[in-house]
Amino acid sequence: MNDISDYIQGELIKTPFNLYNLIAKYIESNKNTKVAFVGGYLRDLLISKFHKKSFSKPVDIDLVIEGSSISLAKFIKKNIVNVDLCLIKEFNLYNTVEININDYKIDIASARKEIYSSPGLNPTVTKSTIEEDLKRRDFTINSIAFEVSTRKIYDLYGGIADIKSKRLNLLHSNSISDDPSRLIRCAKYASRLDFNISNNSLKQSQETVRQWPWKSSETHQKMIYPPALGIRIRMELAEICKHDNLTNVISIIHKWEIISILNENIKVDKRFLRGLNWIKKLKGNHMLYLLKDSEDLEKACQRFLVNNSEIKILEDYSNVKKILKFNQKKFMHFSPSSWTEFIEDRNLNDETVKLLICDGGPYWRKLFKWLFIYKFIKSKKDGETLKKEGWDPGKEMGKEIKRLRYLEIDKLYRN
């Protein structure tokens, strides 16, 4: 283990802003205080060592302290040099602090113990030790810590062995029921790191999902889902969409037979996955794409705290999809201006149009052209010009401006 400890220390000393040495100085002036590096940064260092896999420079660094997280954060801010920006955000609920230094983020957590009273709810938190803090982690590969003062490696759950074996192991038998968003994270790691989920962890995941939805309370016989759970899943998906291959992650979730954690009505086939790629290219709302074909839209929206404007987008999508399906002969002969009128008279949101594009089918090119071309074309004559030509302001002038705009749209198409 000494060679691993030497390797980790050698890499941590290279962390930006002389962070490692700043922490060592803090420990010197605060005797008996333990500070450890934990989480993804440490995991990726070990993956690099054992599998020669290179990662981009770290932008997120996680620390855990047996003491005051804010005290360490203030010490770092006071003593750090040669930085343009250093901001501190406190989160009192979990005794955590986020430091933003230029483009880097350092999360400092006071060591804590978490108890989940009900699946998917936020936990009750009490102060604890580094060893106890590691018990609340999601996977063994993320439950490794390196204490700065003693150079001690904490590996209570065989995380290093799992990294060597490229294996994803949940930490304990209640890992998924405590926080079902860990399913999404697990698929993310499988995709990003090219790791495989262990049989026991897969079995736990499948059994827990079969019990979905988890009820937090009932009001007037109407199911209320734990709001924290929906938020966490949406946040995980947003991070994946930003930094990973969402299509690959969803394929893995489907392969593991746990897709109902997102939506039991999702049919994962080539068309669906192609649309998922498109929604990312269009910079659309991936959550709405995952929910768009829900049989019980109200329940699906409730599950993921979909707001009213997003619900309107989904309802419009569903209605327009039906109209297009049952009038195919009519729409096949629509001109660009007719498509423009069809979309704009219904006041369709761009996100609705993106969902329709991602469905593919015979009309996606027309909808695509409206989204990126036709909607931006204007009439060559505005209201002031028409007034000079003798038009009176009002409804008729508006109709004329619209007619002239439609002529420009169709002219562009012909040319």
Regions found by a protein language model. Give the residues of each.
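Catalytic cores of the polymerase beta-like nucleotidyltransferase superfamily
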Residues: 1-415
